[in-house]
């Protein structure tokens, strides 16, 4: 329904079709005329009024748009014409300015040319005047000479007049005038901006000059060329000159280098280096590692300059780049307090700390950093290291850091010398630190200080009372008796040692202890040994490095700098350093990082090398400098009698070449302290009816210490003897294994003289050295070149058999000679 309504409302069209018929005449294929009827249908559509109105509106709209577009184009054309007009005016103005500038420049050039001409004229006049003066002077000199010549005799008149008539031509004035004239002519012919043209004339006498002038003209033409093809003057010059000889680069050689690396550095083939080394008597492969000296010889042989470089050159350079010529001043002593458990070490430390730290700081010690310094009544300073036990003390010594100057040995007056007291004495002696003995607990009624002195005599600690150099000070840590006397004794000992250090300069010290704090990161306690450590310094500590972000003293207060013998807590390192590591201030953080990475890379090699350090089989490599080798031993036994017997027997084993040194001995099981001492001293540990505890076993495993258990003393002594025998230099002995008598001599084209022999004794071997005897006198010593039985090459011939022997490099064998075959045998020496 809706569709029908829509169709009714739609504009109606009236279509009229017209049919038209017509006739077209044409020519057929046979040439006759032919008529064809064609029907044309035309269709005309008549639109209604609505459609006509819509078409008119569309036409009006199109007309308006066309007019609008025409107006816009007209405006654009007008704007374009105005822009072109403005541009033309601008070009006209610029052209006028350029012409004005050109005219002014032309005027300036004219003025310059005029001024130049005037100067040239003035110069010419001056030259002319100078020439005239020179000629007048020469003429006067000639006339004067002529006048002098008139007074001479008539015989010499003609000759002298001729001589003086030429004077104006040969005198210095005339020569000067001629030189001036030549210079003037040269200057007159030159022009600043023009090339002098050759004169056109007849044929040249030589073709070479003509060719040169032609090439010059060609070059000038090329230089003066115009356009993009014109050549620059610099293009005529040769850009590269071939060197007369091959340039030899400097070769940087480390401590070791492979043949391939050396070839790359020398820019040659590896085969050339192998050939050179073959000529030098060394057979190598392309990947073989050669040492620095060999590489230097090869490089110099091939004409290169060698620069030797150590692998740790950067580390040495960083360490040596320090302040020098700084003045040394007196420094405070660094003291470690050691002793047996419950003998009063901690009480003594606490009393000194409370009594000598300033009143305002007495209760203000917020944290314990392992070290602190106090001032005495005289205003002098002492630094105390609080190292619980002896492990840290020995570890620092094992790493080569001698932090302690003086050891205070605390012994209880009522208890006497105990096992840990003896250990402390051994550690102090191993570190070469002087002892000061503090006899504690003298306030007790059962105290007996004299007994302590007597017992320490047995351990070579001799008091001043008995003529020794060890100070004994009776103290009471509980009541504070003798504390000032102890401090005075420490200061007296430090004066004897004459302790000095550089105060102003880059600091160096040792790490006392370190740990990782959750909030602050790696924290290290550093004892400054020389120089001044400032906040912001770059510190290198073993494998770690970093800039000092903060420094605190033992009271927890922030400080800006610390001098010698001052312990400080440092923040800012890249990691936690090991106790005993050396701390050094360096200038460059980048170089410090490189050194730290280099040390980390070398750590594994050092660890592997340490595994072989204390093995019995390699004790020969640990020989001390000189002829005498030392075997360090630590002895632990179940009873004192066994210890004394073993130590005495070991001392008796010592010889002129190998000495046994008992580094430590004691009663009881093997402790961590014993293991640390063995690692520090490269010692063998011997346990007689005792065993190591768990912590000691861990240290022994980490440090690869040689630990041996025994229950029979003879087995112990025999193995120590074997170790000492291995450290002795071996002996070599010659043993005669065969003798052959020469029965006849034959000549061989290849081997020369061949001795026909009968083996009379022993065995003749092909590869053994020989001697030729004549009348029981050795006339030649060498080796065999050939050994044959009949026509077969053999390796050995037994007694009673005939053989042919060719002696290498010796042809004077005669009938009746004896050929003696021997071998060199290594005889192991035993103690």
Curated annotation (Swiss-Prot):
GO terms of molecular function = GTP binding; GTPase activity; guanosine tetraphosphate binding; translation initiation factor activity
Q: Which organism is it from?
A: Histophilus somni (strain 2336)
Function noted in UniProt: One of the essential components for the initiation of protein synthesis. Protects formylmethionyl-tRNA from spontaneous hydrolysis and promotes its binding to the 30S ribosomal subunits. Also involved in the hydrolysis of GTP during the formation of the 70S ribosomal complex.
Q: Gene name on record?
A: infB
Region: Disordered, residue numbers: 1-236
Cite the record's Basic residues compositional bias ranges: 190-200
Residues that hold GTP according to the record: 339-346, 386-390, 440-443
Any GO CC annotation of this UniProt entry: cytosol
Q: Which family does it belong to?
A: Belongs to the TRAFAC class translation factor GTPase superfamily. Classic translation factor GTPase family. IF-2 subfamily.
Q: What is its main location?
A: cytoplasm
The segment annotated G1 runs over: 339-346
Q: Where in the cell is it found?
A: Cytoplasm
Segments carrying the region annotation (G4) are: 440-443
User: What is the designated name of this protein?
Assistant: Translation initiation factor IF-2
The record lists the membrane-crossing segments as: none
Region annotation (G3) maps to 386-389
Region listing for G5, in residue ranges: 476-478
Give the HAMAP family listed for this entry.
IF_2_B (MF_00100_B)
InterPro entries on file: EF-G-like_DII, EFTu-like_2, IF2_assoc_dom_bac, IF2_II, IF2_N, P-loop_NTPase, Small_GTP-bd, T_Tr_GTP-bd_dom
Using the record's annotation, list all stretches that form the tr-type G domain: 330-500
